[in-house]
């Protein structure tokens, strides 16, 4: 079906400057989150060369180590989370570059350089974990959130909260 243009709202590159205009202290951390990432996991099934980047099973945006880290000592879990989230940030940035949608990243990076925000990091999350089979039917696994805690954990870790 056609997309209803009235429901789209403003483009991300227009929204972020409005949000940044309301930050003044330079202490805020900005998490740029791609939600509904389960939908993007379906793209490698189509024959489009731009989707190939999503087919790599070793990519951090195709893995979620949140539960595995709970068995680690807090300092090791924090170090692994930091390394993982930095790698994920690089992958999401590359994905935006691949689809020629760097405007939000450029605006956010400039705000960090100017001191309007303390840091910026990219995340990919999915509340459901997998695309439903039909409009009213979940997959066999049901709801299995994917990386939804990452932005929150990043914020907490900056405040010294043990992960």
Where are the predicted features?
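Conserved C-terminal guanine-recognition region of P-loop GTPase G domains, centered on the G4
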Residues: 1-116
